[in-house]
Regions:
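Catalytic machinery of carbohydrate-active enzymes
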Residues: 1-405
């Protein structure tokens, strides 16, 4: 153990009990906690295990630096006696023994299960107890959460910091019985200074997307991405326009944006991305736009390929959804259309990635349909596009983002 690692974790059966991060949310929510994972791994000298939900979590995080085991729980509301997966989760938690837990959800449905596994309030840092601040972005909140030390580790943490020497620059945070401490020096100081999501692109991911682009004859051409759909757009026709779909923007508007991209960038390939259920919407947009250089690839994009594609794209226009956050995290410049969600708290962030955020009001309330086509065009004109990212020898590291074997 070196002075640069704050390794204060207990031992269980001779194995290191790694930090556990609990976060149940949409893809964007999970991307926004990536800096928290990085910070916890640096502070505690071990990969961070992740408890979440959704089939996309493993493709998003499996193999990413600083991530340990990934466990999924699809149905949190089921009682223990009815849920085999919850009983399996309890068994795994009991086998690993007491460990520090960062519980990032405010509903706290699984706090009793953690206590049953031996991780009571002494071991758990609860987001609800720490509390958010007005105007605080979720990335910054998660950083404060990561710097909060569970009471069970407070004494040994203070001893470790006394041995390592004083650390300045980070005020302590109080959260009931929990106390935050300044971060210990990381593997490199830049790791802790980088507060924004930064997803790695593996060599396997790079090779896959390059082969795919080569087969499509798109390798070497500027790539422009359009994400019009979200999880609600699997509905068709008038149901897309339901009041519950706060991320709907008129199809004719999207068609106008696709035509604008084609006119301004005649050498580019325009790719309509998304999940397979959003492919029908993309087909409709292509029909309305009538652009020969635009293609629907929503049926061909597993998450690792999407990330690698975004790492090569010159720019993207998107609604506020998960792929907007992954784009920012791999350095893809983007224009993001927001509905009712607060961009102050959840706008995509990615270090130096250029992000143009648009939001408009209708009858005094945020409404995505109030965003004009002209506003999107002007935002695109302001956006500094990435040049030369889709070459035959392009690597994600060339764009300033992590690449790993």
């Amino acid at each position: 153990m070196t002075e640069s690692s704050l390794n204060v974790l207990p031992q269980s059966s001779g194995l290191l009990a790694r930090p556990l991060l609990v976060r149940f949310g949409a893809m964007g929510d999970l991307v926004l906690i990536q800096p928290m994972i990085r910070l916890l791994a640096a502070r505690y000298g071990a990969p961070v295990d992740l408890l979440a939900a959704g089939g996309w979590v493993r493709p998003l995080y499996q193999g990413q630096p600083d991530v340990g085991e990934i466990h999924l729980l699809a149905k949190r509301k089921l009682p223990l006696w009815l849920s085999a997966e919850k009983r399996q989760l309890l068994q795994w938690l009991q086998q690993t023994g007491p460990r520090p837990v960062w519980y990032c959800d405010f509903d706290e449905k699984l706090v009793p299960l953690l206590a049953q596994a031996g991780m009571d309030e002494r071991w758990v840092v609860r987001a609800k107890a720490v509390g958010t601040r007005d105007g605080e972005h979720l990335v910054d909140f998660s950083q404060r959460l990561a710097r909060t030390v569970p009471p069970a580790l407070r004494h040994v943490t203070e001893q470790r910091m006394e041995v390592s020497g004083p650390h300045g620059g980070q005020p302590a945070e109080a959260a009931g019985a929990q106390t935050a401490h300044p971060a210990a020096p990381s593997r490199t100081q830049a790791d802790l200074d980088d507060r924004d999501p930064n997803l790695g692109i593996s060599a396997t991911m790079q090779a896959d997307v390059q082969d795919w682009l080569q087969a499509k004859r798109w390798l070497g051409k500027p790539l422009l991405l359009v994400q019009a759909g979200n999880r609600r757009t699997m509905r068709t026709g008038l149901r897309r326009r339901m009041s519950t779909n706060t991320k709907w923007w008129p199809e004719d508007n999207w068609a106008a944006i696709i035509r604008m991209l084609a006119e301004r960038h005649p050498d580019a390939v325009i790719l309509l991305v998304g999940a397979p259920p959003e492919a029908d919407l993309n087909d409709e947009l292509l029909q309305r736009a009538g652009v020969v250089q635009a293609f629907n690839v929503a049926r061909e994009l597993p998450i690792p390929r999407l990330l690698a594609l975004q790492a090569r794209a010159a720019g993207m226009v998107t609604v506020d959804t998960g792929p907007a956050h992954t784009a920012a995290a791999v350095g893809c410049p983007l224009v993001v259309l927001f509905g009712v969600a607060d961009p102050v708290r959840i706008r995509p962030r990615g270090g130096n990635t250029p992000v143009e955020v648009l939001q408009a009001m209708h009858d005094g309330k945020p409404d995505m349909t109030a965003i004009s086509v002209d506003a999107v065009v002007q935002a695109w004109q302001r956006l500094p596009l990435r040049q030369g990212a889709n070459g035959e020898d392009t690597a994600a590291s060339a764009a300033g983002h992590v690449s790993y074997p």
